[in-house]
């Protein structure tokens, strides 16, 4: 667990089950999960409100660890309330603008803000993610002014990817914190 920042875990549509790397990180590193009232029928307004409450409840600056739909949540949040966010680690950003890639219930998060984030960020993508084309994920990273890593063919980088606690991902997250001078 970092001592200079609070780390908030932001799952995407459907939440992250017990074998998802986000759940492992929460258990193993003491990070906090931002809970949503409805994981299966999200509304941008409700999710933004819950994220804002979670950020405001922290006594320190915050680093966000987002997966899938929650990456769009972070981009929207950055448009209005970024002051306590010190960085974001964005994994498998779902392309909520694509009917081919994303279910209807997630499209209420579009359009995806494509302006530079006001805090350092890093996007991690897979070369065969069914919810975002690899080049589109890199486009998001470039638009947001974020670093970018393609970890190869690991699907949606979730429990089905077979990564377990994904120690390589956590090492990359820690390296980002150090690079951002937050570790």
Named regions from a protein language model:
Residues 117-118, 122-125, 129:
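Short beta-strand/loop motif that positions the catalytic acidic residue
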Residues 2-60, 180:
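Active-site catalytic motif of lipid deacylating hydrolases and related acyltransferases
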Residues 32, 142-158:
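Catalytic histidine neighborhood in serine/cysteine hydrolases
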Residues 64-75:
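Gly/Ala-rich beta-loop-alpha elbow adjacent to hydrolase catalytic centers
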Residues 22, 133-141:
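Short alpha-helix in the alpha/beta-hydrolase fold that links the catalytic acid
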Residues 15-16, 127-132:
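Acidic catalytic loop of the alpha/beta-hydrolase fold
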Residues 83-98:
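A conserved short beta-strand
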Residues 159-175:
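Post-His helix in hydrolase/transferase enzymes
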